């Protein structure tokens, strides 16, 4: 006879406790414990231990590596983030804010897979078949039929998968699924963890790629215990400003590929469109000849990404000047402002400073330091930086400009987009092999950058 009891779970890491705790001893999170009913087996509760059958260990040399190739999703930006395509038997978690486009992205992927004659089942626990059909019609005609299932009972879903043996399964969303063996409601910590565990075992045993949609909390992490992210093979976050048209797909965990790649999409009336050249997309509509506007180049994995850095420096009306940073680290901006005040003598203590990465981008790469400094100098001196100039480099506390990685790829991207001048760290100059078509200027310190912005040349 199964015996019911209650256990407290930490919502952050999944730590179990017989009583409520104010602070989790594992992850140190405060007020994170919730009470969940669980089912204990009678034999385990009574202390009776059954004899388990021993498993035979296998020598690694006798295991043949899988010859199965990755299956392309049909969406090149999606394939880039996954590491080249879908790995059979993988469990992929796709998280993001409500309404950001997770279901739309996976429905478009389903359409592309069906066109490749890939057996796919789309399981929805949030929408009816009629609602999914309306969304599918908006995305465009499906050349091949897509198998749909509106179900939240995980036992029924598992039996359906075993019966039809698809190659790819999409679960939308994991918070709506429930197991009958767990007495708590759908979306609870124990239900989400158990459902993910069942799907993981199913994916490995049947060699089926399973995508699960997970909603995020107000802190921006997937709802449910943090152990959920440790159970899956890949964790993708679909993010972006809901008021902007572009979306970014990032991998924060990937057992089968890099976590440094991003996929860029644009939300349009027909769904999500791939952005093949994100640099050109980010710089569209940039004003020319305006003080405080500078183009920088950041690296997202192996892809150079050009973006506009904006700065507004003006006289303050408060005793303590305001400092705001949108899209980059606030403390880093304060550090750079202090460097300018100390090394160049700029009177920034009496000025408000507002820093913004145009388009709602969020970056913390040190390589955009020099562009932030250039934008601040440009706004402070009211001297516009030429629109065909691109700047990148890391700035140290002594005002020196340090080398950054992949400098040649950044310069090559600037040349491809028609930029004529590129200001880079002096220590990176020796690694730039091709300078045809673009003028590359080495910057040793912030004084060199100040001279370039004010006079157009750098002192020897």
Question: PLM features: residue spans?
Answer:
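Peripheral, non-AAA+ core regions of ATP-driven protein-machinery
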Residues: 2-12, 16-80, 87-95, 100-107, ...
